[in-house]
Amino acid sequence: MPALHIEDLPEKEKLKMEVEQLRKEVKLQRQQVSKCSEEIKNYIEERSGEDPLVKGIPEDKNPFKEKGSCVIS
């Protein structure tokens, strides 16, 4: 099946698609950014102690740590 290119559609079809998308979006529940950002901040702060990117990975559990060295003589 060929890919759908919006620019190849007639104007009427483009407008139908836009109206359909807007009908979907109008049903979405929206929240204030100030409230959502506070919730996200709290979520991150509560879990930062468990985050390996913040806390780091213990040496004994680091799968990327070199196991040993190789000497070629």
UniProtKB/Swiss-Prot annotation:
Q: Which domain of life is it from?
A: Eukaryota
Spell out which residues are annotated as carrying Cysteine methyl ester.
C70
The record's CDD domains line, in alphabetical order, gives:
GGL (cd00068)
- Give tissue specificity per the record: Abundantly expressed in all tissues tested except for brain.
UniProt key word Magnesium: no
**Claim: Nucleotide-binding is one of the keywords in the record:** no
Q: Where is the lipid attached (S-farnesyl cysteine)?
A: C70
Quaternary context: G proteins are composed of 3 units, alpha, beta and gamma. Interacts with beta-1 and beta-3, but not with beta-2.
Hey, which family's this protein in? Answer: Belongs to the G protein gamma family.
Q: What is this protein called?
A: Guanine nucleotide-binding protein G(I)/G(S)/G(O) subunit gamma-11
Q: Which organism is it from?
A: Homo sapiens
| Taxonomic placement | Eukaryota, Metazoa, Chordata, Craniata, Vertebrata
Gene from which the chain derives: GNG11
